[in-house]
Amino acid sequence: AGVDLYDAKASFVSNKVIKIVAGEDSEQITADTIVINTGAISNRLPIPGLKESKNVFDSTGIQKLETLPQRLGIIGGGNIGLEFASLYANLGSKVTVFETANRILPREEDIVAQLAKEYMEEDGVSFVLNAQINALENDEDDNVILSNHGQKMSFDAVLYATGRKP
């Protein structure tokens, strides 16, 4: 089955008809099956300093790092955060995951979350549960200083993996 891909704005005219607009051009397309992929961006929490601080990345930006951070802080203990925690720990980074819930993978069954945590701890990943990130800032060496419940910790880089939104 062939697939036609359009990079355009679209709106439904009816159940099987969409209107697509790309720049000045527009057309209507009829199909039995229409798949819409709206994309998604990282959900950025309103943490003071998150947007302004250097060496703070979303899941796309951290993949572009040219050097491995020795110390990586990860805000978010869901699927994305844990995937990167495992990857960077196995590459040699000292990884600390901060999760606001009382356990990682809060949407999964308890046993799954517990086993994942145990396996990752065996790989050297540290976890801070019930975290409350108050602020991020850079020191004079551009290290990221993360404040959790007022306690400050220093990282070479911080990943915020707090979900995706359309």
Language-model features and meaning:
Residues 1-75, 132, 145-166:
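FAD-binding core/adjacent interface of flavoenzyme oxidoreductases
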Residues 63-64, 69-73, 79-140, 148:
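Rossmann-like dinucleotide-binding cores of NAD(P)H-dependent redox enzymes
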